[in-house]
């Protein structure tokens, strides 16, 4: 995965040893991803002299980072960009009946101990799931717009306690970042729910949560984005998301601020 490898390069420049997950061949979906892989990665890093263990992710892997950190106490730094605060239904990507993505019945984003974690099901089934995303993307002028999918699904199925991520179990430091104008899901609402949950429950982690008015789904550190796209990174974001086209300066300012904040968190 090119974006993941680029993120690794950015982290390596900060002097951090990095392992990264890899998508399956011809399967870029997320469904019943075994958290044992994270568990084994932690053990491998420990056995090779790494005293501090952190996890970072963006988008669906931002949710993965939160979920893993809530289960594995060896993780002492968690960075989640545009996460959700709950686990949702697993999905596949590819080509099926003219659709590029579809939900998988009975499967969660993640599994542990051979069992899918409890998840919020999508209210749209195949092929309506992708048709709705495609229609919303065209209507809003975004590369992809699935926010309505998540809003409608939560309206139909109130998220249960088991489906929410137990963020109060996260150890060490927790850094959350998102933007109000995220076109994929309402990460700003989810981040604020995490803050409320932590305010209501005993926890040991030190949390820093930042939500920008403008930043799109690509709330990457500016240096990381430029590593991914050395030429034309800002143009790519503007082409991908209508909010970046309307507010390019604000989005870039957010990425620069994220770069500073995240670098400080990692190097502390």
Where do the protein language model's features map onto the residues?
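Accessory cap/linker subdomain of secreted extracellular hydrolases
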Residues: 79-167
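Catalytic nucleophile-loop/oxyanion-hole region of alpha/beta-hydrolase
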Residues: 22-54
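Short beta-strand/loop motif that positions the catalytic acidic residue
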Residues: 170, 176-178
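Acidic catalytic loop of the alpha/beta-hydrolase fold
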Residues: 181-185, 216-218
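Short beta-strand immediately N-terminal to the catalytic nucleophile in serine-hydrolase-like folds
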Residues: 55-58, 81, 177
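Short amphipathic alpha-helix adjacent to the substrate-entry channel of hydrolases
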Residues: 3-21
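C-terminal catalytic histidine-bearing segment of alpha/beta-hydrolase fold enzymes
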Residues: 192, 196, 200-268
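Short glycine-enriched nucleophile-adjacent loop
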Residues: 62-73, 78
């Amino acid at each position: 995965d090119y974006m993941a490898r680029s993120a690794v390069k950015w982290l390596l420049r900060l002097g951090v040893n990095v392992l990264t997950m890899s998508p399956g061949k011809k399967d870029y979906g997320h469904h019943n991803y075994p958290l044992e892989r994270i568990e084994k990665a932690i053990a491998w890093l420990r056995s090779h002299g790494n005293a501090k263990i952190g996890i970072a992710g963006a988008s669906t892997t931002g949710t993965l980072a939160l979920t893993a950190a809530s289960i594995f106490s060896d993780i002492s730094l968690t960075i989640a960009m545009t996460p959700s605060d709950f686990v949702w239904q697993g999905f596949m990507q590819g080509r099926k009946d003219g659709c590029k993505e579809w939900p998988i019945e009975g499967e969660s984003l993640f599994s542990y101990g051979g069992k899918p974690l409890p998840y919020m099901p999508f209210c749209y089934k195949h092929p309506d799931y992708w048709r709705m995303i495609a229609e919303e993307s065209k209507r809003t002028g975004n590369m992809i717009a699935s926010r309505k999918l998540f809003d409608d699904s939560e309206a139909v199925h109130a998220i249960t306690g088991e489906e929410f991520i137990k963020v109060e179990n996260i150890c060490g430091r927790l850094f959350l970042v998102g933007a109000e104008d995220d076109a994929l899901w309402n990460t700003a609402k989810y981040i604020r729910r995490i803050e409320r949950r932590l305010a209501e429950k005993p926890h040991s982690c030190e949390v820093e949560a930042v939500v920008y008015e403008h930043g799109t789904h690509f709330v990457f550190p500016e240096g990381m984005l430029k590593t991914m796209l050395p030429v034309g990174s800002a143009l790519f974001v503007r082409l991908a998301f209508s909010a970046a086209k309307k507010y390019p300066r604000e989005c870039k300012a957010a990425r620069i601020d994220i770069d500073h904040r995240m670098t400080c968190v990692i190097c502390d």
